[in-house]
Amino acid sequence: MKTAELIFVPLPETGHLLSTIEFGKRLLNLDRRISMITILSMNLPYAPHADASLASLTASEPGIRIISLPEIHDPPPIKLLDTSSETYILDFIHKNIPCLRKTIQDLVSSSSSSGGGSSHVAGLILDFFCVGLIDIGREVNLPSYIFMTSNFGFLGVLQYLPERQRLTPSEFDESSGEEELHIPAFVNRVPAKVLPPGVFDKLSYGSLVKIGERLHEAKGILVNSFTQVEPYAAEHFSQGRDYPHVYPVGPVLNLTGRTNPGLASAQYKEMMKWLDEQPDSSVLFLCFGSMGVFPAPQITEIAHALELIGCRFIWAIRTNMAGDGDPQEPLPEGFVDRTMGRGIVCSWAPQVDILAHKATGGFVSHCGWNSVQESLWYGVPIATWPMYAEQQLNAFEMVKELGLAVEIRLDYVADGDRVTLEIVSADEIATAVRSLMDSDNPVRKKVIEKSSVARKAVGDGGSSTVATCNFIKDILGDHF
């Protein structure tokens, strides 16, 4: 039987890799005509361990192979990453195009000349940052599909920006932060200040507009979300409107739990044993992603809030981007002693396992989309504290559009030139967390309901399973 091979080109960052690999596994499990998923792994300078992550995540899946690309000799200057991360990433991918082109051409040539007993390349699945590779797809006569690791809301912004650029050909400025925008994928008007911080930078804004423009050239767009969690935006994209077909295939999650060499086995067991001893829904989990670093004064305010509330907690503190600092070092003197027995402070926490535990009752999160979907899957309500990328938009959508989260902040920014200098006070944090942990808060009931809906979406006959099967039918056509 003639079988298909699909080539994936992800952005080699943790959040993008996790959902990309899980989606590849789902395709292999859904249709036996797909026999191979080939992942082309670029060597991103600020994510040097991507290959190791890929290897561990795919070790048990023989249908996935990794092709590691060599380092490029002239990467973009690292200082560009601090001022315009979107531009850095697009420039990095552009510099990888010659190697990507040669690798894809070789894979297609090899499959075409191998006869009927081997798999044949059926198409490209590209991270949304990799839209420039659509040109390579055309060159080798393959359809290109975009995989949105984020949600419909962010796709709606990418659809909106090129139209805005035609009317107002410049980036947003600080004075437009309070401006409320009509973005067709949203029910409510969207404050400019919750858009990705890059829209306020000339280079980043241009990069986001370029991505939005090129999305039109894709054969289709796969979105890591599900119709029932973003119904208005999903309906908007289902209407076509001279746009590629959009497939809601989420939630695409790695729920096996993830280990980290920084957390010894004994520490993990101790943490889970402590959770086992706590009452149901009584523990607050605070975790801000792999890049979520707060200044010391803000850590002090969070600590004071936890003492004001008096609730049980697990708090993952990163003191630097490497995550190798002492999490207790920036804490107020005596905090660890005063909260002994009712709180755990660590540098890394097994997020999936904690959210899955019945003792966990609330999640203070940076609102990365993977984290949001994990919290919905396990029915744990979120208090929003966005940090970077599109997290401010995710926070706005969860609080204002969907009523699925409690607001600490919607527009907090922790990177680039728009970093938030204001310190969020202990009182403000405590007020939001008390609301979050209130068993009568209607947000909690809605989130628990979405947990059931999310599981149905990816179950047999669920909306996302049907959408994924439709995608498979479209990309394979009548050739397999």
Curated annotation (Swiss-Prot):
GO biological process: one example: abscisic acid metabolic process
Keyword match Glycosyltransferase: yes
Residue sites binding UDP-alpha-D-glucose per the record: 290, 349-351, 366-374, 388-391
Pfam families: UDPGT
EC number(s) from the headed UniProt entry: 2.4.1.-
Family, similarity comment: Belongs to the UDP-glycosyltransferase family.
Biological role stated in the UniProt entry: Possesses low quercetin 3-O-glucosyltransferase activity in vitro.
Name of the protein: UDP-glycosyltransferase 71C5
Organism: Arabidopsis thaliana (Mouse-ear cress)
Organism ancestry: Eukaryota, Viridiplantae, Streptophyta, Embryophyta, Tracheophyta
Gene encoding the protein: UGT71C5
